[in-house]
């Protein structure tokens, strides 16, 4: 039996050509694996059949949308995962679930190697290969674009010469990656960081300059997970999809950033994540109501480190798993409702309520009914400022000598 290579298959030109390209370069049989994480487009059966028509000996497709939303997007939400305070890990958080299915397929079909379509200068090569090495240490990895010199021009020529059932003439000027958590756009004229994005860059969001009437939504959370919208129960996937639709219609979630890549270069990226950004804003505000101050301060540090690990392809690392435990513990009391207005590119919190919150009206009010004993303040201030007072006394004494 020939060696087998499992290929992360998208159904597009590059990975369709890679089936035959890998076979000719290595002599191995290719098993195509397509994972649906909410990227839209063609249905899985069409993609599966194309892989077989392009020469794959097996084609495995998986609808991982619910799994992706529940087991990957929700932890990112609970961590308030925003890389460089801006990017909600759109691509980074999808790679581990794809890796999981690639490794499972390799074991199922007896493959010794996993192939992916990443270049040698992006983050995804690291995310895929570190994940594969972790879950399937016996597996080898190859990247046709990086390792077998498969350029787009060669891919077009190969497809035409071999009559592959794939479109070769239409070329999008951008490199696009998308899933239910968001959409990433790069390359083309965007590589000049002075160039403003044009309208054709965007797909998940409408122009916020001319928005429809404001849209008010109430998001209900249990343990940091959205469980209802406007009182209607939803799954995590449904929550993201509905918020994508509603926030996207208002132009919420457009991000334009020069990003520090893992491989050491800076890259200009355009992201659209209407649902993710609105949900993170709502979740963060509910945490303000429900999490104790010192715990909240430390969680921000933990969340930032968690985000960096996921961005860097360390989803399966021991440290990330340990941080998961802390973050999950902080979510115990993150229950309640957030009212939010979506309008003109902004998701603005206008109300919050929680039965497990730490906000005490009687302590906070300045009106009648105030139960805060202000006489305690003087002693607190004296003790709180003691160390600074003593240090200042020392400095003044030394200055006088």
UniProtKB/Swiss-Prot annotation:
GO cellular component: cytoplasm
Annotated compartments: Cytoplasm
GO biological process, alphabetically ordered: argininosuccinate metabolic process; L-arginine biosynthetic process; urea cycle
InterPro entries on file: Arginosuc_syn_C, Arginosuc_syn_N, Arginosuc_synth, Arginosuc_synth_CS, Arginosuc_synth_type_1_subfam, AS_cat/multimer_dom_body, Rossmann-like_a/b/a_fold
Domain of life: Bacteria
Pfam family, one: Arginosuc_syn_C
HAMAP family: Arg_succ_synth_type1 (MF_00005)
Name under which the protein is recorded: Argininosuccinate synthase
Natural source organism: Kocuria rhizophila (strain ATCC 9341 / DSM 348 / NBRC 103217 / DC2201)
Lineage, broadest ranks: Bacteria, Bacillati, Actinomycetota, Actinomycetes, Micrococcales
């Amino acid at each position: 039996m020939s060696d087998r290579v499992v290929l992360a298959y998208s159904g597009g030109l590059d990975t369709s050509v890679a089936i035959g390209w890998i076979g000719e370069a290595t002599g191995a049989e290719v098993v195509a694996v397509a994972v649906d994480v909410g990227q839209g487009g063609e249905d899985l059966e069409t993609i599966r059949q194309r892989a077989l028509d392009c020469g794959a000996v097996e084609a495995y497709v998986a609808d991982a949308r619910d799994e992706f939303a529940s087991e990957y997007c929700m932890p990112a939400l609970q961590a308030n995962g925003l890389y460089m305070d801006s990017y909600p890990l759109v691509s980074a958080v999808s790679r581990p679930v794809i890796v999981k299915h690639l490794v499972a397929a390799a074991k199922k079909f007896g493959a010794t190697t996993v192939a992916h379509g990443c270049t040698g200068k992006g983050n995804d090569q690291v995310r895929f290969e570190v994940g594969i090495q972790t879950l399937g240490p016996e597996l080898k990895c190859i990247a046709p674009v990086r390792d077998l010199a498969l350029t787009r021009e060669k891919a077009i020529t190969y497809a035409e010469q071999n009559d592959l059932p794939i479109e070769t003439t239409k070329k999008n000027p951008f490199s696009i990656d998308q899933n239910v958590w968001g959409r990433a756009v790069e390359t083309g004229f965007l590589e000049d960081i002075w160039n403003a994005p044009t309208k054709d860059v965007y797909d998940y969001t409408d122009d916020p300059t001319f928005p429809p009437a404001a849209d008010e939504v109430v998001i209900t959370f249990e343990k940091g997970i959205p469980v209802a919208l406007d009182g209607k129960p939803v799954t995590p996937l449904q929550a993201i999809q509905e918020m994508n639709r509603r926030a996207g219609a208002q132009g919420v979630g457009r991000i334009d950033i020069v990003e520090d890549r893992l491989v050491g270069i800076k890259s200009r990226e355009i992201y659209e994540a209407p649902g993710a950004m609105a949900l993170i804003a709502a979740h963060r505000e509910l945490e303000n109501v429900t999490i104790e101050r010192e715990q909240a301060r430390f969680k921000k540090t933990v969340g930032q480190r968690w985000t960096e690990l996921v961005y860097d392809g360390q989803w399966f690392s021991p440290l990330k798993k340990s941080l998961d435990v802390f973050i999950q513990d902080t979510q115990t009391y993150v229950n309640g409702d957030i009212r939010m207005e979506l309008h003109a590119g902004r998701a603005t919190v206008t109300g919050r309520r929680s039965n497990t919150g730490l906000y005490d009206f009687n302590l906070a009010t300045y009106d009648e009914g105030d139960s805060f004993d202000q006489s305690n303040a003087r002693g607190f201030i004296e003790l709180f400022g003691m160390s600074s007072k003593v240090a200042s006394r020392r400095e003044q004494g030394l200055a006088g000598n």
